[in-house]
Curated annotation (Swiss-Prot):
Its main location: membrane. GO terms for cellular component: plasma membrane. The keyword Cell membrane applies. Pfam families: YidD (PF01809). This is Putative membrane protein insertion efficiency factor. Keywords: Cell membrane, Membrane. Could be involved in insertion of integral membrane proteins into the membrane.
Amino acid sequence: MTGPARSGAAIRGAGRTVARGLIFLIQLYRHMVSPLRPATCRFVPTCSQYAVDALDEYGLIRGSWLAAARLAKCGPWHQGGWDPIPERPGCRVNCQDASDAWAVRATRGESGSLV
């Protein structure tokens, strides 16, 4: 691999590294600072979990944009509630298959179904 293809891969790799660094900083906040403050997030998942999920799923640029947009919604002017990261196009889950996944029998010492 040479030329533009190689530099594109290097940029994506650097973006992943920076995204992982941001996730680490968010996790530090979640485990060190957040427990010292009262729970005030009006969203599920919380804004910090949303940011981790967005960075993990979409990478540095789009994940940061999604996290910033979510933080901009955080305030008394928004009702909050369920607000997951958007699905990637073409990654829809079949609801029948998803409900069947909860009914799988536990094996080798794993926990059983929650439902």
